[in-house]
């Protein structure tokens, strides 16, 4: 058996040690300038929530541009939550992959999630809660690494793994513009519209070149930002989609207990041991 040697990192290297990685400004990946530009273009922001608020950088942008907005920070642990008390009006520690958001139905004007969704499996539940919490006309602004960035396309062409989606990393979901919109279309159809799509960071170029390149070619950028607007009442489409599509993964669907109605295993199924409740039930196993 041939032994495969350890692959050396390329572009997105460990600790930024690769010479090409040193050229880039890692702060560009979070696109604070993109967040500011998109938030500046919104009006009537009364309730704003940030999922995975981290250091509170993006909430600080909202506070500066919309000083009267009520800011809600949601974090998974107490490490960041303590510091967020100075940045947000309310701070909650919650598991966004399992818990309901601390928002009433149709309460939020804007929900943000920057460099968060790629860390999650339960994407259907998260979007279910976001769309439940947004008012009609409210916006969801999220930034995610782009699996179709220019440097990732090059890496894939030579048989290397995309830097943002390695098995030995914290990222569990890849995103691209086309696939993200296909996901939204499948789950809510005409219930949303994409109002803005932007790029940030352009590997392996320094910031002075990265920004204009990301602006001109966002689908090739390292990070992609979506600003979507909720255009209709939400009917639970995200939570029920895994069952309707018969996805054979035990996705969490909260208290949406109607999921199993969509599952009708064929009578001649060769796998008589299939437990549809285990696959689709709303309760954890």
Regions found by a protein language model. Give the residues of each.
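Conserved N-terminal segment of class I S-adenosyl-L-methionine
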Residues: 1-104, 110-112, 124-127, 142, ...
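Short, hinge-like loop/turn segments at secondary-structure boundaries
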Residues: 89-92, 157-161, 214
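Short catalytic micro-motifs in class I SAM-dependent methyltransferases
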Residues: 114-119
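Short glycine-dipeptide loop
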Residues: 134-139
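Conserved class I S-adenosyl-L-methionine
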Residues: 141-163
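Acceptor-substrate binding/catalytic loop of class I
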Residues: 163-179
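Conserved catalytic loop of SAM-dependent methyltransferase domains
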Residues: 181, 186-223
């Amino acid at each position: 058996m041939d032994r495969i040697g350890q692959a050396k990192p390329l572009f997105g290297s460990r600790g930024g040690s690769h010479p090409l990685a040193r050229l880039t400004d890692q702060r560009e990946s979070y696109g604070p300038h993109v967040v500011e530009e998109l938030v500046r273009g919104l009006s009537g922001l009364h309730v704003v929530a940030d999922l995975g608020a981290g250091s509170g950088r993006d909430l600080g942008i909202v506070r500066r541009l919309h000083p009267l907005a009520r800011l809600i920070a949601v974090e998974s642990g107490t490490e960041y939550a303590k510091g967020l008390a100075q940045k947000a009006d309310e701070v909650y520690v919650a598991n966004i992959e399992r818990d309901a958001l601390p928002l009433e139905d149709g309460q939020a004007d804007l929900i943000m999630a920057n460099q968060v969704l790629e860390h999650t499996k339960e994407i259907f539940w998260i979007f279910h809660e976001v769309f439940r919490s947004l008012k009609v006309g409210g916006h969801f602004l999220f930034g995610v690494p782009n699996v179709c960035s220019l440097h990732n396309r090059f890496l894939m062409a030579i048989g290397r793994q995309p830097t943002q989606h390695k098995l030995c990393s914290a990222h569990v979901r890849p995103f691209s513009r086309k696939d993200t919109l296909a996901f939204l279309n499948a789950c809510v159809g005409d219930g949303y519209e994409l109002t803005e799509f932007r790029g940030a960071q352009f590997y392996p170029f320094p910031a002075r070149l990265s920004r204009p390149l990301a602006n001109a070619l966002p689908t090739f950028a390292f990070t992609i930002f979506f600003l979507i607007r909720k255009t209709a009442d939400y009917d639970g489409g995200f939570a029920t989609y895994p069952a309707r599509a018969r996805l054979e993964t035990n996705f969490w669907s909260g208290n949406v207990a109607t999921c199993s109605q969509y599952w009708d295993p064929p009578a001649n199924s060769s796998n008589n041991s299939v437990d549809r409740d285990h696959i689709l039930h709303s309760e954890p196993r």
